[in-house]
């Protein structure tokens, strides 16, 4: 069984993406790892090269900045990395530059790959998500935040990244996936206000025209943490690869989590209550088809 990790990145230093930690978090279960490094204006390439693993294959890409709709550039870059995967690969393991997998889940993931390798009804594995927000001590948990996503796929030429690289399609249809008891730790919203404001501004350049950016996200904007709906204190442990990064974090998260929930509309509070009691999220968008 051959497993290949794949991802894409550009300007990880400027945007403070933990891409090295992302790669290292799944590298133990990968036989190779393909990373598409875009046309950076910082030392992202040197950062990736510094990992120093023979498993890592770097491909150089140029991002299409003319596409200002739906984040489709992210899907294009994902597809470039996917296309460079060795053809004898059985499973492709996708990780984005602000995601990590806890080492405790690696045996679960590997076992699921082995158990479903010859199951033609399973085309991918579905992960649960923890969205860290503002601080490494809190996770955002509400209808605003997606609960699951596909991160492991059976390698097939018919698979392509979908929309803004949040999910995948196979020959234009949803992928059949098996849910597993493993989490993706999403750290994209853990930065100080100024840094996160800069990241959000750069990110939105792939969704909106410059005029919209200037109006809604002016330069030097500080991010407003007050729109998460609901924060829950995280009582678990972080991946080992994240420990040093967490230790050097030097900002104070000063948002009162109890005030966020009060901002939710009555409708959202009712829907959230139903979900909390039943685990049923009414109207949930699912970019996949679950199978057992």
Q: Language-model segments: which ranges?
A:
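Active-site-proximal specificity loops/subdomain of glycosyltransferases
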Residues: 3-11, 16-21, 37-94
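Glycine-rich, phosphate-binding/catalytic loops in enzymes
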Residues: 23, 52, 109-113
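Short, well-ordered coil/turn elements that cap or connect secondary structure elements
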Residues: 28, 51-53, 87, 119-120, ...
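Hydrophobic residues within beta-strands of alpha/beta enzymes
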Residues: 33-34, 92, 125
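Catalytic-site signature of metal-activated, phosphate-bearing donor transferases
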Residues: 74-79, 102-292
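Hydrophobic targeting segments
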Residues: 2-7, 26, 32-35, 184
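The conserved acidic donor/metal-binding loop of glycosyltransferases
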Residues: 96-100
């Amino acid at each position: 069984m051959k497993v290949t990790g794949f991802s894409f990145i550009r300007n990880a230093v400027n945007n403070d993406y933990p891409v090295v930690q992302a790669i290292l978090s799944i590298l133990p279960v990968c036989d190779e790892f393909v990373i598409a490094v875009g046309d950076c204006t910082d030392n992202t390439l040197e950062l990736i090269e510094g990992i120093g693993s023979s498993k890592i294959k770097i491909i150089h890409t140029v991002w299409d900045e003319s596409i200002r709709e739906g984040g489709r550039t992210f899907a294009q870059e994902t597809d470039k990395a996917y296309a460079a995967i060795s053809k004898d690969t059985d499973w492709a393991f996708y990780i984005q530059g602000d995601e990590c997998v806890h080492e405790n889940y690696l045996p679960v993931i590997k076992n699921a790959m082995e158990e479903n390798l010859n199951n033609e009804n399973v085309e991918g594995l579905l992960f649960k998500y923890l969205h860290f927000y503002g601080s490494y001590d809190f996770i955002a948990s509400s209808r605003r935040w997606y609960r699951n996503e596909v991160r492991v796929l059976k390698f097939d030429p018919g698979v392509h990244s979908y929309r803004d690289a949040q999910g995948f399609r196979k020959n234009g249809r949803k992928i059949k996936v098996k849910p597993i008891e493993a989490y993706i730790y999403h750290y994209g919203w853990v930065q100080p206000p100024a840094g996160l404001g800069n990241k959000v501004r750069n990110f939105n350049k792939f969704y909106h025209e410059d005029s919209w950016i200037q109006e809604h996200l002016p330069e030097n904007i500080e991010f407003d943490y007050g729109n998460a709906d609901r924060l829950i204190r995280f009582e678990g442990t972080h991946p080992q690869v994240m420990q040093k990064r967490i230790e050097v974090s030097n900002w104070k998260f000063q948002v009162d989590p109890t005030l966020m929930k009060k901002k939710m509309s009555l409708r959202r509070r009712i829907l959230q209550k139903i979900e909390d009691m039943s685990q049923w999220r009414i109207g949930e968008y699912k970019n996949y088809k679950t199978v057992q």
